[in-house]
């Protein structure tokens, strides 16, 4: 996860959505 925030479900889902 890019950033200093906690790896919340919504955060990693958003990251994966941007990654694919």
Swiss-Prot record:
Organism of derivation: Chionoecetes opilio
Keywords of this entry: Collagen degradation, Hydrolase, Protease, Serine protease
Name assigned to this protein: Collagenolytic protease 25 kDa II/III
One GO molecular-function entry: serine-type peptidase activity
Record-stated family: Belongs to the peptidase S1 family.
Domain Peptidase S1 stretches: 1-20
Catalyzed reactions per annotation: Hydrolysis of proteins, with broad specificity for peptide bonds. Native collagen is cleaved about 75% of the length of the molecule from the N-terminus. Low activity on small molecule substrates of both trypsin and chymotrypsin
Stated role: This enzyme is a serine protease capable of degrading the native triple helix of collagen.
EC main group: hydrolase
């Amino acid at each position: 996860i890019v950033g200093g925030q906690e790896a919340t479900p919504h955060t990693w889902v958003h990251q994966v959505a941007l990654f694919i």
